Amino acid sequence: MLLLIKYTLLYGIVLMLVALGGMFSEHSGIINIALEGIMVIGGVAGVLTLTLLPAGMSPFLVVLLTILAAALAGMVYSLLLAFASINLKADQTIGGTALNLLATAIAVVIAKSFSDSGSAKLNYCNKPFLFSIGGLELSVFVPLGIILLIISYVVLYKTRFGLRLRACGEHPQAADSVGINVYKMRYAGVLLSGALGAIGGMAYIVPPVQTWNFEVGVAGAGFLALAVMIFGQWKPFNIFGAAMFFAVFKSLANIADSTFLAQLHWSSNIYNMMPFVASMVILAFTSKNSMAPKAEGIPYDKGSR
């Protein structure tokens, strides 16, 4: 049971962070399909920072600097999507897909450049990111994720910034008519998405293991986070619940060998497929009631009203 709780929290926080990132982007009117790639970029930036920091540095500084590095890398990478979608008015789905493909290639090149073996694997120490409560090992991303969840809710619903952001995703022409700079708000939404997605990527890669092969990217976690965002109806606390729901399915592959599930003698691939199958089934039944921002995916042209 402790193992199930451990992995559910581990994966649930990852999915929640990335889905919250997608939520900010889509509330501004930009569909961020590039979450998968942003996770990879955040992961490789965080791991690289972790390996380059001097030995003996305090664990708090290690955690702080690596998370900041990941968030900054994610924001910089998300600027590519923002520029293509907002300034060039490119198709957001195609642009995001291209960035997903590019991210893995970039991560592999970087990893091979810093790997002693010349492979795409990087070794690192993840001990600063782990702590125990009553025999339950958790990562620092669990409390950080809860804090960011609360902050996201407050920012989105209790601040002028959040009101303006949502206005740009619902009716950008009306927002512009009252003096809101739609372009700046959409850039802000995508940048927030990049930061949260990158932190989520680092949370996915660093705590569970001490070696990561960047050729596998993040194994579809970014796309699963998109399903979490849709199932959560673009609302922070709904997203948290949806993330934990999908995380239970994703956790089964990690605990199958040590629980009664081992008696079924199923391949781990079956358990790895479960969250994706569940997402398709759930979205098939709930997509009709979707409350997506009305202007998401539609390039804004100030001259057309």
Range-by-range predicted roles:
Residues 92, 103-158, 259-270, 297-305:
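Transmembrane helix-bundle core of multi-pass membrane transporters
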Residues 212-276:
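Transmembrane alpha-helical segments in multi-pass inner-membrane proteins
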Residues 18-19, 43-47, 104-108, 142-154, ...:
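Hydrophobic core segments of alpha-helical transmembrane domains in multi-pass membrane transport
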Residues 24-45, 86-99, 164, 209-223, ...:
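Short, non-helical or kinked segments that cap or interrupt transmembrane helices
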